[in-house]
Regions:
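Predominantly the C-terminal beta-signal and adjacent terminal strand-loop region
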Residues: 40-43, 74-84, 88-91, 132-189
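Short N-terminal segments immediately surrounding and downstream of signal-peptide cleavage
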Residues: 19-31
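Gram-negative (and chloroplast) outer-membrane scaffold detector with strong preference
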Residues: 25, 33-35, 49-126, 184-187
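Cleavable N-terminal export/targeting peptides
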Residues: 1-22
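C-terminal beta-barrel architecture of Gram-negative outer-membrane proteins
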Residues: 125-133
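N-terminal targeting signals for Sec/Tat export/insertion, comprising classic cleavable signal peptides
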Residues: 28-29, 33-44
Length: 189
């Protein structure tokens, strides 16, 4: 009985999943948090969480109603204000993601996404270290949950996770570890 109920639920969820869906250009904004850590610890406060904001845009090509591929260009900036200066971390990235909106109800669809990207990281850091900039290219994993509302509005909760640590530009002994956790809104044209 459980197998039959599962098969019926799966069939109902996939009903209409292979109908064509509109492809879109989209633009959006992101906010979130970025836990950042410098290793090995140069000073006692080398781990912190920074507020992040950003913008993104791209093209979403829909194969079917429940499956799409998107190319995206995004910029994220994480800011940590301190007493006398601000620590600024930036990520400029180009991403390719697969989206699967597997559950649809009336004007709403819900699903997951995952993909890969390449990004350029830069951080200007003044935590008691001289020559403390981190910069370099790194690969990214993109994962998250998303929902499309009324075909034009998309909200997402996701993360951009670098493949490896970013090396210090001047002192090769220090590395920057970070994850960019964000909530995003996009308008699809």
């Amino acid at each position: 009985m459980k197998k039959i109920a599962f098969i019926l639920a799966l069939w109902a969820g996939l009903l209409g999943a292979f109908e064509p869906k509109k492809s879109n250009i989209y633009f959006g904004a992101m906010v979130g948090l970025a836990p950042i850590k410098i290793t090995p610890k140069p000073v006692s406060d080398s781990s912190y969480t920074a507020f992040l904001w950003g913008a993104k845009g791209g093209y979403q090509f829909a194969f079917f109603k429940a499956l799409a591929l998107r190319g995206e260009f995004s910029y994220l900036m994480a800011i940590k204000p301190t007493a006398l200066h601000t620590i600024n971390t930036s990520l400029l990235s180009l991403n390719i993601d697969v989206l699967s909106d597997f559950y649809t109800y009336k004007k709403y669809s819900f699903g997951v996404y995952g993909g890969l990207g390449i990004g350029y990281f830069y951080q200007s850091n003044h935590l008691g270290m001289k020559n403390s900039s981190f910069m370099g290219y790194n690969g990214l994993f993109n994962v998250g949950l998303g929902s499309t509302i009324d075909r034009y509005h998309r909200i997402e909760l996701g993360a951009k996770i670098p493949f490896s640590k970013t090396r210090n530009s001047f002192k090769n002994l220090y590395f920057l570890e970070s994850v960019f956790i964000h909530a995003a809104y996009s308008y699809m044209f």
